Amino acid sequence: MDQKIKSNKIYKKKNQIKKMFDRLSVNYDMMNTLFTLGIDKIWRKKLVNKLFIYKPKKILDIATGTADLAIEIVKIKPKKIIGIDISKKMISVGNKKIKKLKYERIIELREGDCEKIPFENNSFDAVTVSFGVRNFENLNKCLIEILRVLKKGGILLILETSIPKSRIIFFCYDLYLKTIYPLLYNLFSKNKNAYKYLRNSSLVFPNGKKFNNILMKNGFINVNNKPLTFGATSLYFGKKP
């Protein structure tokens, strides 16, 4: 009975997140640019530059959203990029961008959940996630699934928000989240609950060494992270043995 209640709660929260991103899909790209002052593009380029070192041919982009990262990855000329996301409307926006750029042969978007990735074992050379890990309902289950679909020696690269270590930088970061962020958000969205969720999830996510430890406990090796923009974001790396 307890397990059934737990499963129902997980489904309910996941469904709420799905609906939230469906509602945000129309203005999502513009909101990202405004909220990060355009720095999100630099962060994605950092991930792609790291990815290029390993020259992966087949890549899975989880929580692909509107496909910003998948589109950036095209620059390193992989054979195939498959993006999955639980939000149909985010995927719809992404597909329009892909069609406009004529990337249909390289990028394929599908509706999919990281807790049950719809691919066989050892399918991908690399898996990427850009600002989606903190939305995973069952983080450990998703990481186990990622490890499963990676080929031996395949890599995982994750971009995620983190907490600046410097007190001064954290003060500025927290002030921004409490003042400027909600003002910008209210201009483009009437969903206050979405703002609260996105802000709070950024603050409570187990970043830095804590997240490194989670990756290692789930079977990844050579795990490390690199803070970006004074620690407001981190780039995580892990490898399948």
Region locations from a protein language model:
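N-terminal auxiliary segments of SAM/dcSAM-dependent transferases
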Residues: M1-K18
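C-terminal alpha-helical "lid/dimerization" subdomain adjacent to the S-adenosyl-L-methionine
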Residues: Q16, L159, I163-I214, N218, ...
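Hydrophobic beta-strand segment of the Class I
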Residues: Y28, V127-T128
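Conserved alpha-helix/loop element of class I SAM-dependent methyltransferases that forms part
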Residues: L37-K57, E72
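Class I SAM-dependent methyltransferase SAM/SAH-binding core
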Residues: K58-K116
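A short glycine-rich, Lys/Arg-flanked "PGG" loop and its adjoining helix->strand segment in the class I
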Residues: N140-K152
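Core SAM-dependent methyltransferase catalytic element
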Residues: N212, N218-P241
